[in-house]
Every structure is written in C-alpha cells, then in structure tokens.
Amino acid sequence: MNWHTLYSLVFAAVSLKSNGIIAPSSTHSGVENAVIIQMFQWDWDSIGEECTDLIGPAGYGFVQVNPPAEHIQGLDWWTDYQPVSYNIASKHGNRTQFKWMVDKCHATGVKVITDTLFNHMSAVQGPSTGTAGSAFTKHDYPGLYSYDDFHHNCGTPNNIIIDFNNRYQLQNCELLGLADLDTRSDYVQARLVEYANDLRSLGADGFRIDAAKHIPANELEAILLQVPGFRSTSLYITQEVFGGTQPGEEVRATEYLGNGDVHVFEYANEIKAAFISGGIASLKDLDSRGWIPSASANVFVVNHDGERLDKSLTAHSPSNTYTLGLVFSLAYPYGRVSVLSSYDSGIEDHDVGPPDGGRAKCIGTGQDTDANRGWLCQHRWTAVAGMTRFRNAVRSTQLENWQSPQRDRIAFSRGNAGFVVINNSDSPWNATLITGLPKGRVEVGADGNVTIEIHGRSAIGIHVRET
C-alpha cells in the first residue's frame, strides 16, 4: 500500500518528497495545543490576520512575537533586541496594534508569547532617539534608568564578556557591548515588573526571556514572582540559556528550571548532525542525553539565532533534511516544540531585516517564496501544519515500536494514537512495519503491521484521533 492510499484513509498524513504543502484542516479541540510558532519579524497586523486565517484553525497553541518595546532605530532584525524604553512602540507596531493582534489571536484560541528583554538595554554610545522618539544614551534613559542602574567595571577590557564559561563575567559584564542592567537592584526589578505587568494587561500569555543565562536565576525569579500567573498555567515562561548542560560549564541550565521552560540548543545541534551525516537511527534516545527533563525543555530544529550561526538545519539545508527534521521534532516526545517562521534572505545575510518592513502575507498554501515576497511561511508547510495536528492528537503518549533497519530510516509509534516513518536516504523504502495502531484503521492488519512504500527523502505521519 503506498502513501497515497494512506493519506485518503487517515486524519493527517505528510508526504515530503520536496517541500510540498497542503492546507491544514480547520478542526481543533478546546484542549490546549502545544506547538509554538515563532513569527520572526512579522508585524502585529500581519500576525493578527494570520491567526485568523490559519494559525488558530490549524491548531497551533502559541505565537511567539518579537520584542514589543521601543528600541533603537534601524531596519536590521537585531535592532529589536536593543530596547530604549518600555513603551509598546517597536518597528512592528504600536500599543493599539499590539492589543489588536493579541485579541485576534485569542479569538482563535492562540496564545501570545512576547520575546522579552530583562538583561540589558542598548549598545548605542552617543545621544540618540528610539523608534517612538525617546531620547537616550547607552547608560541614560530619562525617566527609566541612569548610570547607577547598570553594571560597570566588571574586570574585563571595555566591560565586555570575554570568557563565556565564567559565571561572574556572564552575569556582570556586557553581552556584545549592550548596557547590562543590575537586576539585583530593587529599583531595576520594579521597572522590569512594571513592563511585564503592562504586557500582561494587554493580554500577553507568556514571555521568552532573552539572554536569561546572563541574569542570575534567583534575580530572574524575584522579578517573575511579581507577575500575575507566574508558576501557573496562565503564564508560560521559556528562557534562553545557551548550553549549561555539559561538564565544566559554570552556569547550569538546571538553575533556571524553577522559573519555567529552558531552551535546549544542544537538541538543534543533534538534529542537524543526525540528518546531515550521523544517521537518524541515533536519535532514538534523544530524550536521555543528560540535558534537562522533557517537561521543562523548549526545543526547536532552528530558531532565529540558529539560522545565523550555522549550527542548525535551515530552509537552505540539502536534501530536504530541514523538513524531515521538523517532522521528527513534532513526532518525537521530548519537550515543547517551537517552529520558526521566518524569511529567506536572513539565512544568508545575517543582519538583514524582514521583507516589506515586516508586513507579511503568505499566499495560498505558502509554497511559493517569491509569491510570498521572500517570506518562508514555514507554519503553512505540510511538515508543520500536518505534524502539528499529529502532535496535538498523540499528546502525552509514549514512544513505542522504534524500528531502524538502516541508519537513515526510522519508524515509530506514539502509543496507539500515531505512527511516523522517515526515510532520510535517497532511495525508496519498501517495508512491513509495526504501527502500534488499532487493527482495521488505515488498513492495519490484525497483527498491527502495515506495508508501505515511501520515497527517498520523504516521511509519512498518521494519527487516528481527531484534534
């Protein structure tokens, strides 16, 4: 039985001979859906429209949006990450537009996570003005912060981090020359709490804490304890902690688990290594590499930094490996998965900002990057839309029936709720496989087996529960 027959008989199936796209079903349940879409550099109007058009109906749980605070001027993407005030007035939209976006997403059952900067302000030395006209210099933000609210004289030239394995430097020196806030200060903490609570008042459901590793975990906790919903299901926290899982690293990822989820960058590195050269059969025990517990892990095949650091699979990776990596990530039971939705030019030009100033629109099924004016629209790809429904359906079921007859061919089930096959080799794969699915579903025999043919560099995902 080939995959075309399978597709006609199940709720969701994915064929990935290339980056083929299908429109997702509009059905999803009231149970919280788990997948986060990082809408990188999309403006607020575009995200609100996309929540209505596709993100909500497709069953995504969250959108992660860029930092909404006023920042330094400029078109490059990284200007968003140099705040100059806590006015909701970034290049992606103003306060009214932000609130409109949140309301539109909420109306379709989608929660909103804001990328949030507690560690630092800008690196701009001389007098300047931000995106909303606020005057500032590197260590003076009138009405907000002054010189004594920052770390100084940390013991390195120019006060910049040199040794990224030294706890004191990591948490007291400047990251890339960015003015480093003294987050131990009661005054600084109060300003950060005001900002977080303002975002909450506008409907924000969670925060991605940028550069969390550069803030002592107890100081970050002191801030978050003053935010309504902290340590409840009403507020999702994920923290950017590079590394911290290997022997000898002074700042440990586990220090931050009490505050929320933690990024697992090692996960992305392992996915790339397996799909490019190491063999995907090695991924069976990906959840037991000594990183952090699945319940606290926020994982991704690539995020916006990974696109620019050459340590992750991207849309430019060869032989459909990026798409297949996404299929695996959404099928495998480790962590909460984030999926990047970005733009094509940023993969090669690491500074360039978004097309059309962030005004994004995915045409039809999102397949044609040219028609989308340079936006990749990954959240509309079959691998993401179809496998998001798969993940929503299988939820907490266990990985079972792992089969890997060759290093680049794997199949496994998620309990009796879902089954996935990935062929990362160039040649077709004809096999009789154990599905774990109930007999009589998708032509599964009485022994629970199914015979399939799957093209090279392709995958199939099946679930038997409506979402």
Task: Place the predicted regions along the sequence by residue.
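Solvent-exposed, flexible loop/coil residues
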Residues: 90, 185, 441
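Glycine-rich FAD cofactor-binding loop and adjacent beta-loop-alpha segment at the N-terminus
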Residues: 83-89
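Active-site-proximal helices and loops of the catalytic beta/alpha 8
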Residues: 9-16, 21-36, 40, 49-56, ...
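Core domains of carbohydrate- and sulfate-ester-processing enzymes
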Residues: 129-176
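Active-site mouth loops of central-metabolism enzymes
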Residues: 35-46, 178-190
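Classical eukaryotic N-terminal signal peptides for Sec-dependent ER targeting/secretion
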Residues: 1-9
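Alpha-helix-centered segments that form part of catalytic cores
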Residues: 15, 164-186, 388-397
